[in-house]
Amino acid sequence: AMDALGFKYIFDYADKVGKPCVISFSEGAGQDFDGEDVLYNEVLDSLTSIPGHVIVSSAGNNGHLKYYMHKPVGKESAGFFANNSRSYVYHIAKSAQPFTFRTSIYEGKTHPTPIDVTSEQVLEAPDSTYFVNLVVAGKQYELIIGAYPSVYHPDEICYDWIVKTDDEEKIGTSNYISYQTMGADADVEVFHGS
């Protein structure tokens, strides 16, 4: 809300002095599929619907993090390694087709412990939230995958995909963590969560 108020203030000043205005803004936020940003987007639309009002935005602003991955139909799998300066990693997967999540937690850097969870298992779990607790290399991890419909495309299901631990200050740095989506019949996008 503070961003939008700042934009309005700047545009009001530009209107007052009779000048067009371009605001350059570095967002730094993750993707939203649950509707949290709908009202904010409506405010931005109303501010930029006036001729001479332009907002240029840079999303992400965290070049060191993996922000997006796409596995198209026909490709069996796609994946990446994940880490964070916190004790958890959080991504959002989105697809209209069923697929399999593979989360691998490595003992050190070479011995993976893979956990496979299907999207159907998540949807069938109580509250569409699937939990797995496991120990790898003496460290306790919790895998949580929760499902909900995309507010923008109701035929697509979004999955909050989280791995957390209290045993690592910076998850994925001593024991590597990889995310993989599998299933040749599914088109899956994965976004970094906030």
Predicted regions and their residues:
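Loop-rich non-cytosolic ectodomains and luminal regions
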Residues: 1-194
